[in-house]
Amino acid sequence: MEWETVIGLEIHAQLATKSKIFSGAATAYGAEPNRQACAVDLGMPGVLPVLNKGAVRMATKFGLAIGAKIAPRSVFARKNYFYPDLPKGYQISQYELPIVEGGELWIELEDGERKRIGVTRAHLEEDAGKSLHEDFHGMTGVDLNRAGTPLLEIVSEPDLRSAAEAAAYMKKLHALVRYLEICDGNMQEGSFRCDANVSVRPKGEEKFGTRAELKNLNSFRFVERAINYEVERQIALIESGGTVVQETRLYDADKGETRSMRTKEEANDYRYFPDPDLLPVELDPTFIEEVRETLPELPDEKRARFVEEYGLSDYDAGVLTATRELAEFYESVVTESGGFAKRSANWVQGDFLGALNKAGLELADSPVTPEMLGRLVARIEDETISGRVAKEVFEAMWNGEGEPDQIIEAKGLKQVTDTGAIEAMIDEVLAANPKQVEQYKGGKDKLLGFFVGQVMKASRGKANPGQVNELLKEKLDS
């Protein structure tokens, strides 16, 4: 029997506010445990939550970016459950009336096709604390610094049909929240994490199978591996006569498998009811339009513009718009180079990103600025240096030896364009290789490349390759 996989993702994006969603406590990562949890976060008697307007603005910004409906009235509810890192005994979330409804994202598949993925809703809620299992002599510690941090939970439609599609959707969403500057997207710190609802059904059947929820997947690789394992597990279980149970499962990255955590709760298990301490959130059209005006150029729009304006391939444009920071870096290189977009793209994607990855650096920590790289591209274009020599200059720039023009001057790397000097080098090369000259004249045209290489070697890469080719042909064909 052929099986079809059905996947829906719930993405939790920590919003980049400086204070928590219902209190003035800081949200900075890495503080000593329990140093950033105030009385509101701890659910102490007599304290009242106050909604952070910045979180509302960020949620609205996200909704507008995906073409969703922004609810003029949304309501916070209490989601009741017990867990050690949930000090109040309930989580403030949104249930029946979320702030964002509908919307869509388009993902690129491996075969180059694009697919629309619907978004059901996105709602605001507070994060829970964190259980710590190491260094406690068999006990569990609880850090409540994270409790009350604003989250935007983004729920997709069950439109994803493979682990690869799920990873592509997650990457697209990750890029978008970073473009919008509403989430730093740091997956190692838990700022962007995912729960995956996975089920299988016979191909062609409309009814959904029983789903399992895979919790807290915090890397693109883990999402793909966990879903693939879970799909295989469910199919094997059904084909052996078993039944898939609706449950929550945890992915064990070391073993590459999922394991059962608990039976999956339904909404009524949480006994949602409107939070009596918080008024409904009412947004007027003026506020929504003000937020709309702050939207940056979005990734898909920027990618299309790079193809149209700079003449890049769709693939190159996709690489260069993967993050807002890289796209801005590239455009600065183009501007500084004098508008040489394609060569700038080649250098950014090739030598620059290669050096960055090799050094394990973030873009912001690069020793080569976009202005420096742009000036290097300009020196290639105006034939001050050859492409080969440019690699030597780039390496020196990366090692902190200065600006491209300083390095070119200090190392004597300017391209030789003097015809007399190049002819003298050609004469020396031809005199040193009489056998090859004879073979070339006998019809071995491919030896021209050999002679060009020898002249370039003699000039230490400084001779103008175009002139070398032209003058060699003149001498050899005469």
UniProtKB/Swiss-Prot annotation:
Keyword Nucleotide-binding in record: yes
SUPFAM superfamilies, per the entry: GatB/YqeY motif, Glutamine synthetase/guanido kinase
Pfam families registered for this protein in UniProt: GatB_N, GatB_Yqey
Entry EC no(s): 6.3.5.-
GO MF annotations in UniProt: asparaginyl-tRNA synthase (glutamine-hydrolyzing) activity; ATP binding; glutaminyl-tRNA synthase (glutamine-hydrolyzing) activity
Subunit record text: Heterotrimer of A, B and C subunits.
Name the UniProt record assigns to this protein: Aspartyl/glutamyl-tRNA(Asn/Gln) amidotransferase subunit B
